[in-house]
Amino acid sequence: NNIIHLQDTKEEEQKTLKEHQDDIVKCAEMFFLEYGKYFTEKEKELVVEACRIHDWGKANMIFQGLVSPASVKKSGMSVGQNVQIPHGFLSAVTISKKEFKKLSDLFCEEDYGPFVTAIYHHHDREDIYEGPAIQEYAKKYYLEQISEYLGKDIKKLYCSNQNKLLYRNNSYTPKAVIASDIWEKYLLIKGLLNKFDYTVSAGYEVSEIVPDLQEKKLKKSIEMHLREKELRPAQKFMMEHADENLVVVAPTGSG
């Protein structure tokens, strides 16, 4: 079952999986070039790796039958009306904790849960598939394809990753109490992953219209205009506290 088309060819204006992966990683990297000072190095690497991995599950033949039916038909595989396991679930159980920690010297064990949860739930899907069903599905429709896509032999999935998830989107899994720092890490990864994913899926290259942070033309223009004028008390106060976070209550017309 040839999966090369996922990397090298286009069909019906669909971007290939490899192209989408490269585009979203580039989008993330461009964002961090502009706004990287607001994030730690670990946070940036967690987001970029999540962008790289989150759509691996799309290599499964049921998904490919939807976006590229001609290629699946050419392979000789019959996918019929089989129910598709969400690709985010497959992506999240394709990487082991050991493999995850090898991605960066900055990654540690407590990063793994937020990371795989962000990938697993990067789309909101009902979470009703347990390990045995996922493994059976993968044997039929995914292991061979993801092995070829990644260029390495993947014999099984790490369905025990479901035990590392911060939550499950179903009615029968007990809700756990999550430490705020762990939950915030998950929100950061998932939020930026979705931001960059939606950006490139909409056909854009950059996720933010970059403000004039370098030359600060608007700021300089305002300062030039005010240079010959006497600042009002509120304006003077704001100028003197420009490096602080402020909440100011002032009447209309204060400047």
Can you describe what each PLM-predicted range is?
Residues 1-216:
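Accessory nucleic-acid engagement/destabilization modules that flank
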Residues 17-21, 224-244:
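N-terminal pre-P-loop "Q-motif" helix
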Residues 168-169, 221-226, 250:
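Short linear motifs at secondary-structure transitions and domain/linker junctions
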Residues 214-219, 242-245:
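A short mid-domain helix/strand-loop element embedded in enzyme catalytic domains
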Residues 242-255:
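Walker A/P-loop
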